């Protein structure tokens, strides 16, 4: 065994032993209404909270009914009947007198005053609170959903603008070498054969993630093959008489992924995602409408053949003998250069054919495809306008989300007090009634154990700490323009960047930019001279209103920034240099909010069970974490250890941050690791000491640094070819006549426009040959290698 392996085993062994010694009691985990009914979709938790209040109200109604029946159906009729009876002799008279006196020991007026009326008043108050909460939460949730849909539509609007600009680039790029603007550099199907807009890696659901377009298309083909098609009695004109019910689609999805979340919210979300991507369309006369319908399990849909035919056409490309107009054919026997020319030719013809189908038919196959300066300026303004709308909708969505969360929290907090009052009132009325009954019986009615209120079953409700939907992360599209003095034109490119809050960290470049922003915030926290403020900020719950304001301020800086790289780290540094209105508690809250908004927790959720079983230490599991997670964990571990050393705090201070959860609603450990589905809040007993041991261990930073260095050393650097450049001419180029293809012959002869050459030397940045088509492209579209 090497010295390195021996040291690693020592670290893992010490970590396991220390975490077991630091186990916390159940009493230190506060489970209340404020941290019980939280779900990522909000509506499930709200419904369970309403159900909980109704159940409490039912307890009051039951006891009220019992006292009412006891008085009106039993005790009063008994007394009345005794008084009506006539004695036949002195013995009967004496017996009736004794019994009447004994029964009068329990006064019906006292039972109603001491037992029934207090519960009735509490019931009325509870029902009033219930109605108010139900209406208010419903209103807040409706506003949130409305803003969520508006933000999603604004995002789609931006993507369509970018997509329309990008599609123009197809006339200048071979199909084999083009890659989608939305694939983050991953290999995917060519955009010329893809009609939906999404980013890869693409997350359809927490259980359905796809690394590239091929994987996604393969999944869709499998799903399509399993969904049973039906024939309608009355077919829709213009569509084939084959459709399927939305319920059938969800059923087959569940078979493909048994752990799929089948809440109504999630089902509707997945269905709407399919509709928005153009994978399915409603089988009805709305086919002729431009309005996008909402998914409904009871409605019928049909597969979009234009999208799903992609995989089939790719698979059968080698067997096709006859090519149709605008299609790309592959032949292993053809020369490589000839294939490339064919690719360019067919891509151009395909683009012209699609453009000719638009409402504006000014440009046809024989017309000019040049774009002058004014046309490009108009497209750019349209994209900027769409981005302004998207930014506004994202800010509104953040506001409505915080208002919804604050409303849920306030009602849960207030009802928690009411619930205690209900419990005390029920116990008091039971005790009063028991005392009155014991006077009548002259003996104890029941033991103290039997007098306890009925307990709720363990699985009655979902229990879990705060969860936040990461919503729709804001992104922007930077338009880069560079002048070409030789050709008197501009080179245009488009680059996309995401705001760090709510965005995934699995993309290396985006993760490094986010890491830079997080580092700046942590350094800002470490400037705080008061150690108690730093410790209390990490211990307290998030002040969502102030932190949301800080987040929106940073979002505004991100939107208005003119930088094109590392924007998150640059705007964060600039913001805190000039703004002093936020305190340490706000900065720590922003870090916590960022952790909660990650699509997957910083410690990947698929290792949650491994940590709960405590069979492996967190350090040993780090070898299986993504490199981006290791970088952030290293930075946070370094931060906690720096706090400990800088302020000369006792060793147990950082441990207490994780272990003492008695006076907070969101345990600190919950920010770092969360289960994808339901989780038992008592798991915090294991997770808290595990994380505290991990972060305070002096060898953790060194271990993580070694793992990161090994990943960088072994990683292979992909060689990327220079993407094609697009040109925006300052003046309109002369029109070159090109013969139109015969109307009934899709294989008609196509003559490409002549290329022009530059007298300047050839360089990678300025190739000598440039296409005669002056069209904008996206620099993110790196040809696949």
Swiss-Prot record:
Q: Where is this site: Arginine finger?
A: 559
Q: List locations, semicolon-separated.
A: Cytoplasmic vesicle membrane; Cell membrane; Bud tip; Bud neck
**SUPFAM superfamilies, per database record:** GTPase activation domain, GAP
- According to its UniProt record, how is this protein modified after translation? Phosphorylation at the C-terminus negatively regulates the activity and the polarized localization.
Write down the Pfam families for this protein, in alphabetical order: RhoGAP (PF00620)
> Which positions does the record annotate as the modified residue Phosphoserine?
759
- Residue positions where Phosphothreonine is found in the record: 760, 762-763
Task: Name the keywords, alphabetized.
Answer: Acetylation, Cell membrane, Cytoplasmic vesicle, GTPase activation, Membrane, Phosphoprotein
Q: Which GO terms describe its cellular component?
A: cell cortex; cell division site; cell tip; cellular bud; cellular bud neck; cellular bud tip; cytoplasm; cytoplasmic vesicle membrane
Check the record and name the InterPro entries matching this protein.
Answer: Rho_GTPase_activation_prot, RhoGAP_dom
Q: Where is the Rho-GAP domain?
A: 520-702
Any one of the GO BP annotations: establishment of cell polarity
Main localization, broad class: membrane
Q: Does the keyword ATP-binding apply?
A: no
Record's bilayer topology term: Peripheral membrane protein
Where in the sequence does UniProt note compositional bias of the Basic and acidic residues kind?
329-339
Region of interest called Disordered, as start-end residue ranges on this chain: 313-340, 732-785
Q: Which GO terms fall under molecular function for this chain's record?
A: GTPase activator activity
Record bears the keyword Membrane:
yes
Which of the residues bear the PTM N-acetylserine? 2
What the protein does? GTPase activating protein (GAP) for RHO3 and CDC42 that binds membranes through phosphatidylinositol 4,5-bisphosphate. Plays a key role in cell polarity. Modulates the RHO3 distribution at the plasma membrane and its polarity during growth.
Other facts:
Present with 1720 molecules/cell in log phase SD medium.
The identity of this protein, by name, is Rho-GTPase-activating protein RGD3
Which species is this UniProt entry from?
Answer: Saccharomyces cerevisiae (strain ATCC 204508 / S288c) (Baker's yeast)
């Amino acid at each position: 065994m090497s010295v390195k392996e021996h040291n690693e085993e020592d670290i893992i062994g010490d970590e396991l032993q220390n975490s077991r010694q630091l186990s916390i009691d159940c009493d230190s985990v506060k489970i209340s209404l404020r941290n019980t009914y939280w779900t990522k979709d909000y509506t499930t938790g709200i419904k369970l909270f309403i159900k909980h209040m109704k159940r409490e109200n039912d307890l009051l109604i039951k006891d009220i009914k019992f006292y009412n029946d006891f008085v009106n159906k039993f005790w009063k009729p008994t007394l009345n009947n005794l008084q009506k009876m006539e004695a036949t002799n002195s013995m009967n008279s004496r017996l009736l007198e004794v019994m009447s006196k004994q029964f009068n020991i329990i006064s019906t007026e006292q039972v109603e005053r001491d037992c029934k009326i207090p519960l009735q008043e509490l019931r009325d108050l509870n029902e009033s609170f219930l109605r108010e909460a139900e209406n208010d939460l419903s209103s807040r949730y409706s506003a949130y959903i409305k803003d969520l849909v508006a933000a999603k539509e604004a995002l789609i609007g931006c993507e369509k603008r970018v997509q329309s600009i990008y599609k123009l680039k197809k006339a200048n790029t071979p199909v084999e070498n083009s890659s989608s603007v939305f694939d983050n550099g991953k290999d995917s199907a060519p955009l010329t054969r893809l009609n939906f807009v999404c980013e890869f890696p693409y997350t359809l659901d927490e259980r359905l993630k796809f690394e590239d377009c091929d994987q996604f298309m393969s999944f869709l083909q499998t799903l399509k093959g399993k969904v049973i098609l039906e024939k309608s009695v009355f077919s829709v004109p213009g569509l084939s008489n084959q459709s399927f019910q939305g319920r059938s689609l969800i059923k087959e999805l569940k078979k493909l992924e048994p752990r799929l979340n089948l809440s109504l919210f999630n089902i509707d979300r997945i269905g709407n995602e399919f509709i928005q991507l153009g994978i399915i369309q409603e089988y009805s006369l709305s086919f002729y409408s431009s309005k996008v319908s909402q998914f409904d399990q009871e409605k019928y849909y049909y597969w979009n053949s234009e999208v799903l035919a992609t995989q089939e056409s790719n698979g059968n490309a080698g067997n096709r003998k006859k090519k149709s107009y605008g299609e790309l054919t592959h032949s292993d026997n053809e020369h490589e250069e000839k294939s490339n020319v064919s690719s360019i030719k067919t891509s151009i013809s395909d683009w012209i054919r699609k453009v000719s189908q638009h409402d504006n038919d000014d440009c046809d196959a024989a017309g000019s495809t040049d774009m002058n300066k004014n046309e490009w300026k108009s497209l750019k303004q349209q994209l900027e306008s769409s981005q302004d709308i998207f930014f506004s909708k994202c800010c509104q969505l953040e506001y409505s989300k915080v208002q919804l969360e604050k409303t849920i929290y306030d009602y849960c907090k207030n009802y928690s007090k009411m619930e205690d009052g209900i419990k005390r009132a029920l116990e008091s009325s039971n005790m009063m009634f028991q005392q009155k009954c014991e006077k009548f019986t002259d003996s104890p009615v029941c033991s103290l154990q039997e007098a306890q209120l009925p307990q709720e079953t363990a699985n009655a409700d979902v229990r879990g700490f705060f969860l936040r939907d990461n919503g729709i992360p804001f992104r922007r599209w930077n338009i880069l323009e560079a002048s070409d003095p030789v050709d008197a034109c501009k080179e245009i490119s488009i680059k996309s960047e995401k705001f760090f809050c709510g965005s995934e960290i699995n993309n290396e470049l985006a993760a490094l930019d986010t890491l830079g922003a997080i580092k700046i915030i942590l350094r800002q926290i470490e400037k705080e001279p008061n150690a108690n403020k730093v410790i209390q900020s990490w211990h307290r719950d998030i002040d969502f209103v102030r932190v949301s304001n800080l987040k929106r301020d940073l979002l505004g800086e991100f939107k208005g920034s003119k930088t094109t790289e590392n924007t998150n780290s640059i705007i964060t540094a600039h913001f805190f240099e000039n703004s002093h209105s936020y305190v340490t508690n706000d900065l720590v809250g922003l870090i916590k909010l960022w952790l909660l908004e990650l699509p997957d927790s910083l410690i990947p959720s698929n290792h949650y069970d491994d940590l709960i079983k405590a069979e492996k230490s967190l350090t040993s599991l780090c070898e299986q974490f993504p490199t981006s997670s290791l970088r952030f964990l290293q930075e946070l571990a370094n931060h906690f250890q720096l706090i400990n050393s800088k302020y000369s705090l006792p060793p147990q201070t950082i441990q207490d941050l994780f272990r003492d959860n008695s006076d907070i609603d969101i345990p600190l450990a919950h920010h770092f690791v969360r289960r994808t589905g339901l989780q038992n809040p008592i798991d915090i007993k294991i997770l808290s000491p595990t994380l505290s041991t991990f972060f305070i261990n002096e060898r953790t930073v060194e271990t993580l640094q070694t793992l990161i260095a090994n990943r960088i050393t072994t990683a292979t650097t992909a060689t990327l070819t220079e993407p094609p450049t697009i040109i925006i001419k300052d003046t309109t180029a002369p029109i070159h006549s090109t013969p139109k293809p015969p109307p009934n012959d899709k294989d008609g002869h196509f003559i490409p426009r002549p290329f022009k050459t530059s007298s300047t030397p050839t360089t990678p940045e300025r190739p000598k040959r440039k296409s005669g088509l002056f069209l904008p492209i996206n620099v993110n579209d790196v040809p696949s290698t």
